[in-house]
Every structure is written in C-alpha cells, then in structure tokens.
Design a protein with these regions (language model features):
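C-terminal "post-core" interaction segments
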Residues: 53-86, 95-317
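Flexible loop residues that form catalytic
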Residues: 92
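C-terminal, low-ordered peptide segments at domain boundaries
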Residues: 1-84
Length: 317
C-alpha cells in the first residue's frame, strides 16, 4: 500500500455514428498510494435547454448521510437562487443511508406548500408498536420519531418547491433512495423514473451494540417498514421505471449532459413535455444537443456517504 504502480492510460472516443468506441493509448503513468473518501454529492449543476426558458437542476447524489446534509442544502440553495424549473435527481448509484437525510431531501424538493405533511411513517413489530414506537417524518418539521433534527426545518429555506421531478434509477437504487420516490409520491408530487427497476428495499435497520465472548459487535437488524402518507409500502419488488433502459453495460457519458443516455432522456422529456418513446437510433452518442450549460456549479468535496440501507442511529440497549 505504500508503493506505486505503473498503469497504461487510454482515451475512449466515439466514431461519427455515435455507437462505436475507439480506444487510443495515452502512455503510462505512475500511480501512488493515497487515501480517498467517496463523496456523497458528485455533482450539482444547472443547465438550460435551447429554445426554452427551462432551467434544470441536476444532482448526482451517492449516499444519504446526516453529516453532509449542510452540503445537500447548499446544492439546493444554488438551485433555488437560479430559479430552477425542473429537477433531475440522479440516484442510479445511491443504495441508501439515513432516514433523516432522506426526509431532508424530500423537504428540499417539496418545499413550504407541503410543510407538516407526512413524508414517511415507520412501522415496527406488534410488540414495539403497542409500546408506542414508530411514527412520522414530516416535511419541514424538526420533531421526528427519532429526535429533534434542526436541518429538517432549515431545509425549507433552501427548497425548490417542485410538483414534478425526474429520477434516474437502477437496480442499485435502494432503501433511502426508494424512500424519496415513495415519500414524494405519497404527497402527490409527480416522480418520473428513468432507468431500471429499483432494488425494492422497503424496510429499515437500526444499529444495536451487543457483547459476545468478550467482544463488542455492532449489529444492524431489519426492524421496521417504511410507508408514505397514503400508507403504501408494498414495493419489495422495486419501482418500475416510466422509461426503461439499462445503461449498466455501456461506458457512461458526462453526467448531467446529453452525452449521458439517462440524462438525455430526462432532458428530452423536460423539453417536449412528453415521455420519450425509445428507438435504437435515439440511444447513440451522435447528433446535436438541445442543452446548453447554465453555469459551472460543481460541488465536490471528500465526504463519506452511509450506503446500503435505510438506517436509524444505534442504541446500546
């Protein structure tokens, strides 16, 4: 781990037909060892669409972690200041995280018109339910079933308040990500899905510390269901996309542009106002782009996402 390796670097370009990759050698480089923390927000930007007055916010969000909700709110503040008309939420690679962060994201999308409405409800087993456990997470309300969480209230100041969003999804999209889809649909916000059927994890976990054989173990058993304001929780087989396309086997284009196939479909949908009907020729990398940049709004900083689950804090009981 303390040494370095020599690797060959190649560049991938595309022939004029937009579908045939060309690999060009760029020589060798020495790659040394270093520490890297995967960011939760890979990209946030605002783009315009030629021939329209649309301003589209794009967020590539990789993991729900309460330690970085301030950065999430900062991204939406940039969206708000530029008066975005539409939102593309890219959750293709987001497999979950903290319930509270999911509620913050829901608040940032929904805004003041939905303040106080139920975003998500947690349901435990019969014994814990009879004991009064379980409860609601509400839009813009800091009091939750877990604890008081100030960012839920603060998020209203940065919310974009949209009635319709576009979400890019895959089989990896799970748990807290699916909670966003389900929670917003429970508020009758239109959530249009593009990609693959999601993972189908409609349950959550809690951290519990236990001692065995003089060792401490932190366990995360599945302990609760997550449902929306309408009581819907039956998505164990995943959410089926409105436009189904598998981009997992291709080399991705630049995120948030027409070079990314799922992003392309979302932008075409936003521009036309109609769900695209896919044809083979429409999924190549050639042709003109109806999109123009509306600013270079990258927000990349080393942060650590909590992935793989809908999670609540650990207990030592």
């Amino acid at each position: 781990y303390d040494g370095s390796v020599e690797i060959a670097v190649s560049q991938v370009t595309w022939e004029d037909n937009g579908s045939t990759p060309v690999l060009s050698s760029k020589g060798n480089i020495q790659l040394g060892a270093a520490s890297f923390t995967d960011p939760a927000i890979y990209m946030d930007k605002v783009v315009g669409i030629d021939g329209t007055d649309k301003k589209v916010g794009y967020l590539l969000y990789m993991g729900f972690n309460i330690d970085y909700d301030d950065e999430l709110m900062a991204a939406f503040e940039r969206f708000r200041q530029q008066n975005v008309t539409d939102l593309i939420l890219d959750l293709r690679y987001n497999n979950g995280g903290d319930v509270l962060s999911s509620a913050v994201l829901g608040t940032l999308v929904a805004g003041n018109d939905y303040k106080g409405q139920v975003y998500a409800h947690t349901t435990f087993n019969e014994d814990r339910t009879e004991a009064g456990e379980g409860g609601d997470y509400k839009i813009g309300v800091k009091e939750t079933v877990e604890r008081i969480y100030e960012p839920l209230e603060t998020a209203l100041q940065h919310a974009v308040g949209l009635k319709k969003i576009y979400v890019l999804v895959s089989q990896t999209t799970a748990s807290a990500s699916e909670m966003v889809i389900n929670g917003l649909r429970g508020l009758d916000i239109e959530v249009n899905l593009i990609g693959q059927t999601t993972n189908g994890k409609n349950v959550g976990m809690e951290g519990v510390m236990r001692s065995f054989y003089n060792h401490e173990f932190l366990l995360y058993p599945v302990t609760f269901y997550v449902e929306n304001a309408k009581g819907f929780r039956d998505y164990s087989t995943g959410f089926v996309p409105d436009v189904e396309i598998d981009d997992s086997a291709i080399y991705p284009g630049e995120f948030g542009t027409m070079e990314d196939q799922l992003g392309y479909i979302a932008l075409v949908w936003i521009k036309s106002g109609k769900k695209p009907e896919l044809q083979a020729s429409s999924l190549t990398r050639g042709g003109g782009s109806p999109m123009k940049p509306f600013g270079d709004l990258w927000d990349i900083r080393p942060i650590r996402p909590m992935g793989g689950a809908v999670m609540r804090p650990r207990t030592d009981e």
